Amino acid sequence: NRFAATIVPSPALARLLAGAGCSQVLLAWPEGKHLQDRASLEAALRGLTPAKVLHAGRAREACTTLEQAEGTLGLPPAVAALADSGTIVVESGAHGALDASLLPATHLAILDARDLYPTFADWAGRGGRSLLLERSSVALVTGPSRTADIEMILTIGVHGPRRLIVVVCEPEPA
C-alpha cells in the first residue's frame, strides 16, 4: 500500500498537517486503486497529527459551524489534476469524498503523477469522460467558490476549500 506506507509517514506531510493548523481531518479514501488498507492510513495519520481523524461520512456533523470548518482538513481521493487551471477532480461515492472536499476550509489532495493532465480536454480524452458519464456527480475543485448572486456582492468561499494543497507523487520504478 504505497500511500499509507510511504507518503503518509513522511516528515513533509507531517509539516503540511502541522502548518494547516487543523483540529480534525476528514478522511474519505475508499479502499481501491491507491489504498488497499484504510486502517493503516488512518493509523499513520493519527501518528502525524494530534488532530482527530474522522471518516468523511461524519463531515456534516464535524463541520456544523464556520469555526469547525476552518479547523478541518479534508482528505478526499483526487482521481486527477488539471495543470492549466490548478484543478483537482474528486468523484462522488459512498465514502463521502464530496463532503470532504466541499465542507472543510483546507483540502489536501495526494495524487499519482500519472494522474496529472495538462488540460480538462486531455483528461476527458483519456478516460475522464467515462467517469463524468458514470457518476452522479464529480467535483472539479479549483479553490474557493465565488458568487455574486446576492445583491451583486462578491462572496468568496461559500463552498469548497479556501486552501488547496496538492502533493504529487512519482510512480515507483518498475
Model-derived features: positions:
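The feature marks the mature, well-folded catalytic cores of soluble enzymes
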Residues: 1-174
